[in-house]
Amino acid sequence: DHRDLHSFPTRRSSDLTIGGAPGDSLTPVDIVKFTYAYCEKLRERRPKAEGERYKVVVGKDARISGEMVENIVCGTLVACGIDVVRAGFASTPTTEMAVIFEQADGGIILTASHNPKQWNALKLLNEKGEFLNAEEGAAILECAEKEEFNFADVDTLGSIVEEDFTDRHIDAVLALDAVDAEAVRKAGFKVVLDAVNSVGGIIMPRLLQRMGVECIEVNCNPDGHFAHNPEPLPANLVELSEAVVKNGAHLGISVDPDVDRLALICEDGKPFGEEYTLVSVADYLFSRIYAEAENTGKSLEELSAPYTFTSVSNLSSSRALRDVTEKFGGEYCAAAVGEVNVTTKMKEIGSLIGGEGNGGVIYPALHYGRDAMVGIALFLTNLAYRKCKVSELQKSYPQYFIAKNKIQLSDKALIDKILDSMKEIYASENVNDIDGVKISFEADRKWVHLRRSNTEPIIRIYAEAPTEKAAEELAGEIIGIAEKIINQ
């Protein structure tokens, strides 16, 4: 599920991550096995002539177990004869960028994203600084289970160098054509930042300072003692909302522990809506090209090159992205849930912008990964140009409400029965089954998405409509039908 992708038992492979709570399901021995298996598969994927070295970047968020996990991962890489670039405290997108900067063969990020502080995990990257896919992850798990080790001899051990990539990442964000730090500086914004005492507390204030933004810091000490549940949902952002109002700030900024998700708070203390982070950034990028096309007479395709005038999000994300894309004459495409599925679809159609409705912005002009830094830089540029309040900006977008529910089942076998029945019952509507079953009721601008959990006998149900009542009613209708099927 794109909202709790990382809360898995040990030895589950997703397109991202292998992990658990250290000492419980992610033991030091497991870390050695997984890292060794990663090295084995890396060599298979990128064969080199004898004597040629492999290089892997390792970065971590500020979790309490981070140093322990980092030492074991780096030691194992060295024992496998691989040279390590130790990036230290780094956001997930920074480590992804570091793989590109270093022209490395891969990367390992030590983070459990928005999970509670006792969790940690290894996120595995390829030579492009992008997540391995599910098949590659499964191959690594299979290799790890064999426990057959063949380490380097003493003359071919790897080396470790330390390097901080924070400023290079910020430089790359500020160098983007669509980012206008000067306009942001002139706007004189004051923001409150909540970085949940992780690595966002290092990179975000530095980026904001370079854009001339006054930044009031809340929970910005990267000690891994998360001040609240680290998932950037409204219930966890009460302290931030209060600080925005109390300080008379223009905006509240919340990031998760590894800084790939961005949630915003309006100047009145109300949530901007994490679904709307991506919507707002896309609206800015499309409107910018559209205005240039109007002024120059050039085509949208010409002006968005080398990308296409398209957007992508996953099936559980708000329809608002499709609406703003189509408003400017662009085309929207949906992908299965999971960052690697979104980026695969984006590459396939050459999207200008994409991401996930959980505050994950993917801007390929920088790199193919969710990145809160590029998200906030684009958002603030737009806010400076629009010269309006954040709450007014939010109201300018199509308004939708998402109801989130789940059905607990006694038997996993019922999942397919329910999903298949839904496809039959709603066959006259627009049905997408690339990832569970999504039924779109076009005339009413509403949809419902049923997805199986990877780890337990649960069906998650997301329903979206233009009003909260309509979303809840749609979810209720689907749950009612599911219960009848269960009781047959």
Language-model-detected regions and their locations in the chain:
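Buried hydrophobic positions in well-ordered alpha/beta secondary-structure cores of metabolic enzymes
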Residues: 11-12, 58, 95, 108, ...
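N-terminal small/polar loop signature for handling phosphorylated ligands or for N-terminal nucleophile
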Residues: 40, 44, 55-119, 206-265
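Gly/Ser/Thr-enriched, mixed-charge loops and adjacent short helices
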Residues: 120-247, 297
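Gly/Ser/Thr-rich active-site loops/lids in small-molecule metabolic enzymes
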Residues: 133, 217-219, 270-289, 339, ...
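Phosphate-binding and adjacent anionic-ligand microenvironments
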Residues: 250-251, 290, 297, 303-488
